A protein has these predicted regions:
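Catalytic phosphate/nucleotide-handling subdomain of diverse soluble enzymes
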Residues: 227-269, 275, 338-369, 375
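A mobile "lid/hinge" subdomain adjacent to the ATP/sugar-phosphate binding pocket shared
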Residues: 265-309
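Glycine-rich beta-strand-to-loop/alpha-helix junction loops that act as flexible
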Residues: 9-10, 99-103, 218-220, 331, ...
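Phosphate/pyrophosphate-binding loops at sites that engage ATP/ADP/AMP, CoA/4′-phosphopantetheine
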Residues: 81-95, 200-207, 320-332
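Internal helix-turn-beta structural module
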Residues: 307, 311-329, 335, 341-407
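Glycine-rich phosphate-binding loop of actin/hexokinase-like ATP-binding domains
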Residues: 160-265
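Short beta-strand-loop/turn "lid" adjacent to the catalytic site in phosphate-handling enzymes
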Residues: 82-132, 151-153, 159-170
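Short glycine-rich, Thr/Ser-proximal phosphate-binding strand/loop in the N-terminal lobe
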Residues: 4, 13-68, 238
Length: 407
C-alpha cells in the first residue's frame, strides 16, 4: 500500500481523499466545511474494497457538527476522523500530501515540492487568484504542520497549459501594461485535461504523442482544451476561469465594454462587476438555474428561457470546437468529461451534430446509453473517435505528488 493524501482547500472548507497509488483506489474521503462559522461540519467516508476490482466498493459515512475556528483545527478534526473511523494512519500513513493550487502563473509549470519559498510564491500569485490561492495556502500551512515529516507537493491547475504558444496566451493589449500586471491567458482545469487526454489515449491503445484531441470539461465550470501530442496548445479559460464557454454561473466570453456600460449606468464597483459575471451570469443569468439538468428538463417542457440558455450554451461550445479543429488541423479524438460532459447525452449530441463535415459522427444509441467508465460514443466508421471519459482530478494529483516525492 502506498497512500497519498490529496487536499483541495478553500477559504472556508477543504476536501480530502486518501488514495492508494498502487491500486489507484480511494481509501477514504471527506469534507470539512463552514470553517470559521459558529458551527462547522465534518464528513468522513471510508471505502471497503474486495478482491475483485470490478466490484464497486462499499462505504461507511459519518458526520459531525462542531466549532472549527480555522484550518489547523479542521485538520485536527480530520485526523480524529481517521483515528475513530479509519483507515488508521498508522497503517496507511501518507507517503506524500498533494495540494491542489488553482493559480501557478507562468512560474510553476510542473508539480512542485513545497518549501517556504514556494509558499511565498503561491501567496504572491494570490493577486491573480484572490478567491482560490489564499484558501489553498491556508490548507498547505495546516497540512504541513499536521504532517511535518511527509513531502508536500503543489499541483497547479494552470501547469498543464504552460505549453501553449505565445500566440495562444497573449492578449492584444499594451505590452508593457500586460507584463507589469502579468495579464495573459493561463487556463484552468489543467489537471483534469491532462488526466482525461492521457486516459483517452490509453483506452484507444494509441500513442499520446500522435494524437490531436479536443477535451471538453463540462461541469458547473467549463473549459475546452486543444491537446496536440499530449500538450495543451490552446484553452478557453483565460487570466481567470471566467473566460470561454458559457458556464453554470459565469458568462464566459463577453465584450469587455459591457463592464464600462454597467459601471457607468448602474454604478457597479469592480467587485460587483466580478460577482455579476462570475455568480449571476451564465445559465443562471439566462434562465435562473445553474444546473444543466434543470435547464434540459425545463427546455423539454417548452420553457423559452431554458431553451435560449441551452442554445447559447451549445452555440458557444460549437464555436470553440470549430476553432480548435482549425488550430489543430483536424482532430483524432474528442473527449467529454465532468458532470455535464459525462452525463448529458443531449448536450453531447447537440454540440457535435453540425460537425459531420469534419468526420465527427455520433452513434445515437451509444450516446444515449448510460454507462460507467470510459466509453466510445461515435460510430465505428467515424474518422474522429468521440469518447466519454470520467475525470479524476484527485487521482491525478495523487499520481503527480507521489512522482515528485519519490524523486
Amino acid at each position: 500500500m502506498t497512500p497519498v493524501l490529496v487536499i483541495n482547500s478553500g477559504s472556508s472548507s477543504f476536501k480530502y481523499q486518501l488514495i492508494d497509488v498502487e491500486t489507484e483506489r480511494s481509501l477514504a474521503s471527506g469534507l470539512v466545511e463552514r470553517i470559521g462559522e459558529a458551527t462547522g461540519v465534518a464528513t468522513h467516508t471510508v471505502f471497503f474494497h474486495g478482491e475483485d476490482a470490478a466490484v464497486a466498493a462499499t462505504k461507511a459515512t459519518s458526520s459531525r457538527e462542531l466549532p472549527i475556528p480555522d484550518h489547523t483545527a479542521g485538520f485536527a478534526v480530520m485526523l480524529e476522523a481517521f483515528g475513530e473511523h479509519g483507515p488508521s494512519l498508522d497503517d496507511a500513513r501518507p507517503v506524500a500530501v498533494g495540494h491542489r493550487v488553482v493559480q501557478g502563473g507562468a512560474r510553476f509549470f510542473e508539480p512542485t515540492l513545497i518549501t517556504s519559498l514556494v509558499e511565498i510564491n503561491i501567496d504572491e500569485l494570490s493577486a491573480l487568484a484572490p478567491l482560490h490561492n489564499p484558501g489553498a495556502l491556508q490548507g498547505i500551512r495546516a497540512a504541513r504542520a499536521a504532517f511535518a515529516q511527509v513531502p508536500h507537493v503543489a499541483v497547479f491547475d494552470t501547469a498543464f497549459h504552460q505549453t501553449m504558444p505565445a500566440a495562444a496566451f497573449t492578449y492584444a493589449i499594451d505590452r508593457e501594461t500586460a507584463e507589469r500586471h502579468r495579464i495573459r491567458k493561463y487556463g484552468f482545469h489543467g489537471t483534469s485535461h491532462k488526466f482525461v487526454s492521457e486516459a483517452a489515449a490509453a483506452h484507444l491503445d494509441r500513442p499520446l504523442s500522435s494524437l490531436k484531441q479536443i477535451v471538453l470539461h463540462l461541469g458547473n465550470g467549463a473549459s475546452a482544451t486543444a491537446v496536440h501530442g499530449g500538450a495543451s496548445v490552446d484553452t478557453s479559460m483565460g487570466l481567470t476561469p471566467l473566460e470561454g464557454l458559457v458556464m453554470g454561473t459565469r458568462s464566459g466570453d463577453i465584450d469587455a465594454s459591457v463592464l464600462g456600460v454597467l459601471a457607468r449606468r448602474d454604478e457597479m464597483t469592480p467587485g460587483e462587476l466580478d460577482a455579476f459575471l462570475n455568480t449571476r451570469s451564465g445559465l443562471r443569468g439566462l434562465a435562473g438555474a445553474s444546473d444543466m439538468r434543470d435547464i434540459e428538463r425545463r427546455r423539454a417542457e417548452g420553457d423559452p428561457h431554458a431553451t435560449l440558455a441551452f442554445d447559447v450554451y451549445i452555440h458557444r461550445l460549437r464555436a470553440y470546437i470549430g476553432s480548435y479543429l482549425a488550430q489543430l488541423g483536424g482532430a483524432d479524438v474528442i473527449v467529454f468529461t465532468a458532470g455535464v460532459g459525462e452525463n448529458s447525452a443531449g448536450v453531447r449530441a447537440a454540440a457535435l451534430e453540425t460537425f459531420g463535415f469534419a468526420g465527427i459522427h455520433l452513434d445515437a444509441a451509444r450516446n444515449e446509453s448510460p454507462g460507467r467508465g470510459i466509453r466510445v460514443i461515435s460510430t465505428d466508421e467515424s474518422p474522429v473517435t468521440v469518447l466519454v471519459v470520467p475525470t479524476d482530478e484527485e487521482l491525478e494529483i495523487a499520481r503527480q505528488a507521489y512522482t515528485v516525492a519519490a524523486r
